[in-house]
């Protein structure tokens, strides 16, 4: 099993969610996040004063899936989240040792 974590622009969330559903994925976890990469933040004007906003709003999507579904999920996220501009985000893939459904005690892919 693998866990995909994708950091994307907030306005792309609905497109990514739909793309993952079309790819056959059932459940995702979404968390609001703030961060920056190469784009470093931006300057804003407030009451006549300029200030630098270091952290930009992002959304983190997490999904656990079988190894055979990883490439399709990555491609679905990449295509749906891409704007072609700096700050589109990142996709991280990591191994998952075990999953347990709390309600039933099911484990492994049965718990996903």
From Swiss-Prot:
Keyword Lyase: no
Any one GO CC term of the record: cytosol
Alphabetized GO MF terms: ATP binding; enzyme regulator activity
Pfam families: P-II
Keywords, alphabetical: Nitrogen fixation, Nucleotide-binding, Phosphoprotein, Transcription, Transcription regulation
Record bears the keyword Nucleotide-binding: yes
UniProt superkingdom: Bacteria
Sites of O-UMP-tyrosine modification: 51
GO biological process, one term: nitrogen fixation
Protein task: In nitrogen-limiting conditions, when the ratio of Gln to 2-ketoglutarate decreases, P-II is uridylylated to P-II-UMP. P-II-UMP allows the deadenylation of glutamine synthetase (GS), thus activating the enzyme. Conversely, in nitrogen excess P-II is deuridylated and promotes the adenylation of GS. P-II indirectly controls the transcription of the GS gene (glnA). P-II prevents NR-II-catalyzed conversion of NR-I to NR-I-phosphate, the transcriptional activator of glnA. When P-II is uridylylated to P-II-UMP, these events are reversed.
Protein family per UniProt: Belongs to the P(II) protein family.
Quaternary structure (record): Homotrimer.
Name of the protein described by the UniProt record: Nitrogen regulatory protein P-II
Naturally occurring in which organism (per UniProt): Mesorhizobium japonicum (strain LMG 29417 / CECT 9101 / MAFF 303099) (Mesorhizobium loti (strain MAFF 303099))
């Amino acid at each position: 099993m693998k866990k995909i974590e994708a950091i994307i622009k907030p306005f792309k969330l609905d497109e990514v969610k739909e793309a993952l559903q079309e790819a056959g994925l059932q459940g995702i976890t979404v968390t609001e996040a703030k961060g920056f990469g190469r784009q470093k933040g931006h300057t804003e004007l407030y009451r006549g004063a300029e200030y630098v906003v270091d952290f930009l709003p992002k959304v983190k999507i997490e999904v656990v899936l079988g190894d055979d579904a990883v490439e399709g999920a990555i491609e679905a996220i990449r295509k749906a989240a891409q704007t072609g501009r700096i700050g589109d985000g990142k996709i991280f893939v990591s191994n998952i040792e075990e999953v347990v459904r709390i309600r039933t005690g099911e484990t492994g892919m049965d718990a996903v």
